[in-house]
């Protein structure tokens, strides 16, 4: 699991991007919301769960998980209590006959 800080200036808010399959920080580097630090997470060959205290300095945390990042967020962000969470185009079951890509296709 790779972590890349796009912004780490001690802002009051954090946007935690759990990026999708084959994506890295370049996918969102054009974003610069005022008042937010931004952490991108990708390359999920190894998973390292986040501890709650990792983000305790922030007044608010927004979790944005996209594609395969939805699966990774479900496994690594269990102790993170975001103020807002968005899962876009993904599932906690990426290879699943009912909720994801059918096993015969994958």
Place the predicted regions along the sequence by residue:
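Active-site catalytic motif of lipid deacylating hydrolases and related acyltransferases
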Residues: 1-58, 104-105
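Short, conserved loop/helix-junction motifs that constitute active-site signature segments
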Residues: 10, 79-80
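Short hydrophobic segments within beta-strands
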Residues: 16-18, 64, 88
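Catalytic metal-binding/acid-base residues of hydrolase active sites
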Residues: 22, 69, 91
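Hydrolases whose catalytic domains are alpha/beta-hydrolase-1, hotdog thioesterase
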Residues: 27, 72-76
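Short hydrophobic/aromatic-enriched beta-strand-loop microsegments
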Residues: 38-42, 83-88
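Gly/Ala-rich beta-loop-alpha elbow adjacent to hydrolase catalytic centers
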Residues: 64-73
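Flexible "cap/lid" loop of the alpha/beta hydrolase fold
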Residues: 84-106
